[in-house]
Amino acid sequence: MVRAEIETGAPFRSVKEAVTLFGERILLGDNYISKSVERSSCKSIQDELVEAKENLKKAEEENKVLSQLIESLTQELETTKEKLNHSLRNFPEHPQVEDDLKFIEESTVNEPDNITEIKMNRFDRNEVYGDRLEKRRSVKFANPPLLTKVIVGKEEKNQVMVKKQTKKMKPLVPLAAWLFARNRSS
């Protein structure tokens, strides 16, 4: 006969310890499936809640960054408008400049401030920053031309054209004659 060993150690200290050792299946029997589904659904809901909170925090941070960018861009826009108006007012002798100045003032008065009306439904960083960079690239130049060179009056255009017309190219005929004359003498 085979001898059987009987464990004489202390029983479990608590039900929780027995559950962690053997699992819920032994203690609950048929109710195991419903309990695990309820607990897993609670855990999944809690996980979704935690994930939603993280997404909300990220969205708030991106919203703060975007609002700061909008504020800085509006300030930059205002300073450039002031500089442009100041530089245009320094050249009042050109009638074309005055017309351009009036056009700029009318366009700024008629257009609403669209920057405050921006509403972002998604906080997709690539789309937002990509659009902003494309706009910046199209606005800024590496070496912007001077305002005095951009605004040229009709008189200055005529002077430049006269200078170009008076400058003549030297004919190539004397050069060719010199080359052929040199070849004949040698």
UniProtKB/Swiss-Prot annotation:
Keywords: Coiled coil. Residues 37-91 form a coiled coil. Belongs to the WEB family. This is WEB family protein At3g51220. It comes from Arabidopsis thaliana (Mouse-ear cress).
